[in-house]
């Protein structure tokens, strides 16, 4: 049985844009956060692809990863993830092959099958391409081929990319990706940071369908976890109101720019909205280090996850850095 100290811990950054802030500052904050969590002992620093969202500045994922990798030295950097229906597999192979060539042994390629946007934005991204989520298994296989060794009959190659064998992860919030990751023998990251409802079933499906591969001899599970750590439970509860406001805005179709914390959410949400936000953040770790340690120990005991990746979208950058620092102390015991 795994203990908390056996589990790797990583960072997922959505590169949040705050109220009256700028994307430029958000991108600089992302690098600063990566540099800090590298010192704190985190395994990876991933960024997520989202489009047409005014509160998230990580749309050009591979470009941002080059910036992050260039400003750090040891931490792995990667996509959490690239939404493959938006892209031709060859282009992704070339982009991540370039990153791997520049920063060998430090690049991860996490793949999702959702567009990471609304239908109108998805059409704007793809233009005349006919790609869709239905093509995902075939696109993953094509990407694996482009990043693997060149075969004698291969007429189209990724350069850079061929032979780099960039580690590929499958990401998802449904059972489809869990089964596919298992059948392909790939590591699996479940999006429990926003869809915890199917977490246990997805882990079961992945492990039951797992077939050893050239990259993995046994299943490897990563779970997404929302984080708000502070010195006291009261301070964490206060800081978390920025997160609640952001999720509430998402559900209402409103601006996603980060808003400052408030003393109370009363009057900001209706009872059914409070319940919906609570479901969305069902796995959230909010509190002091002592409180978070107890909750994480239960999570690891129940899931036997190999790695946890934490997302922390607080209004003040310094509060985010401190939250990750406190978590590192918890994870290291």
Predicted regions span which residues?
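Conserved, mostly hydrophobic/aromatic
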Residues: 9, 37, 41, 49, ...
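An alpha-helical appendage that flanks or caps ligand/catalytic pockets
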Residues: 123, 129-157, 198-305
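Flexible, glycine-rich active-site loops centered on histidine and acidic residues
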Residues: 5-23, 85-148, 188
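N-terminal beta1-alpha1-beta2 module of alpha/beta enzyme domains
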Residues: 1-72
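A conserved active-site cap/scaffold subdomain adjacent to cofactor or substrate pockets
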Residues: 178-197, 202-203
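Hydrophobic faces of well-ordered beta-strands that scaffold small-molecule active sites
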Residues: 9-13, 45-47, 77-79, 107-111, ...
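Active-site mouth loops of central-metabolism enzymes
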Residues: 13-28, 82-89, 162-172, 280-289
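Acidic (Asp/Glu)-rich catalytic clusters
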Residues: 2-5, 38, 65-74, 100-107, ...
């Amino acid at each position: 049985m795994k203990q908390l100290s056996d589990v790797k811990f990583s960072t997922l950054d959505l590169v949040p844009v705050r109220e009256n802030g700028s994307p430029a500052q958000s991108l600089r904050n992302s690098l600063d956060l990566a540099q800090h969590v590298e010192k704190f002992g985190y395994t990876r620093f991933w960024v997520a692809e989202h489009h047409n969202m005014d509160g998230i500045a990580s749309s050009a994922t591979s470009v941002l990863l080059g910036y992050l990798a260039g400003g750090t030295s040891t931490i792995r950097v990667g996509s959490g993830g690239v939404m493959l229906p938006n892209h031709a597999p060859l282009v992704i192979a070339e982009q991540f092959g370039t990153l791997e060539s520049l920063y060998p042994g430090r690049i991860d390629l996490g793949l999702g099958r959702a567009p990471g946007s609304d239908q109108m934005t998805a059409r704007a991204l793809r233009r005349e391409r006919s790609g869709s989520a239905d093509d995902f298994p075939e696109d993953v296989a094509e990407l694996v081929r482009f990043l693997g060794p060149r075969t004698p009959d291969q007429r189209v190659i990724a350069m850079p990319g061929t032979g780099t064998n960039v580690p590929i992860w499958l990401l998802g919030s449904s059972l489809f990706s869990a089964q596919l990751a298992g059948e392909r023998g790939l590591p699996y990251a479940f999006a429990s940071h926003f869809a915890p409802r199917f977490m246990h079933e997805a882990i079961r499906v992945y492990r039951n369908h797992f077939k050893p591969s050239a990259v993995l001899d046994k299943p490897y599970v990563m779970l997404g976890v929302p984080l708000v750590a502070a010195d006291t439970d009261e301070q964490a509860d206060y800081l978390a109101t920025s997160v609640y406001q952001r999720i509430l805005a998402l559900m209402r179709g409103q601006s996603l720019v980060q808003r400052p914390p408030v003393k109370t959410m009363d009057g900001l949400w209706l009872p059914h909205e409070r319940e919906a936000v609570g479901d969305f953040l069902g796995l959230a770790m909010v509190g002091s280090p002592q409180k978070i340690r107890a909750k994480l120990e239960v999570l690891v005991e129940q899931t036997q996850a190999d790695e946890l990746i934490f997302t922390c979208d607080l209004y003040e950058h310094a509060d985010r850095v401190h939250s990750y620092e406190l978590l590192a102390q918890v994870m290291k015991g």
